[in-house]
Amino acid sequence: MRAFYHHTQTGAALRWGLILPAIGLFAVGFAARRAVPFVPLAALLAATGWAFSSLTVEVTQTRLIWFFGPGLWRKSIEREAIMGVTPVRNPLWYGWGIHLTPRGWLYNVGGLDAVELALNNGRTLRIGSDETAALARALM
């Protein structure tokens, strides 16, 4: 189904915050000539940085779809399950990534802005975006 809203937000701080330490671990491992303990951790950090390098949000006629990075992990909900849409600003301590907050699940790669969705099952979730007004309009 064709999306009438599609936006990808790049999470530069999150990406580089994981990839730069990975490069450092590779360098330390090879300089110490003991790469074995460093390489797996460096590879894990680099893979995590790649997997969470961006957040893509799509709104189709019937669904809201979002995924991180290349789309290895996807989430979606029916639009009819969304009872309310509110642009919000997250506190700094909510952070980035995928995690449970006092306001429900948060999916975010950067910045503090998000759209809070009130669902018909009584739960809420927040999807981070640097285009909160456009995303909120697409969902209304």
Where would I find each of the regions flagged by the language model?
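Contiguous hydrophobic segments
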Residues: 8, 12-16, 58, 63, ...
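Conserved beta-hairpin
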Residues: 42-84
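Non-transmembrane, membrane-adjacent beta-strand/coil modules in membrane-associated proteins
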Residues: 66-131
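Short, aromatic-rich membrane-interface segments at the entry and exit
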Residues: 33-41
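Structural signature of transmembrane alpha-helix termini at the membrane-water interface
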Residues: 27-34, 49-53
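Short, well-ordered, aromatic-rich surface patches in folded extracellular/luminal domains
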Residues: 139
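N-terminal membrane-targeting/pre-transmembrane regions
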Residues: 1-32, 106-112, 119, 124, ...
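Short, small/hydrophobic-residue-rich motifs at membrane-helix boundaries and re-entrant hairpins
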Residues: 14-23, 41-44, 48-51
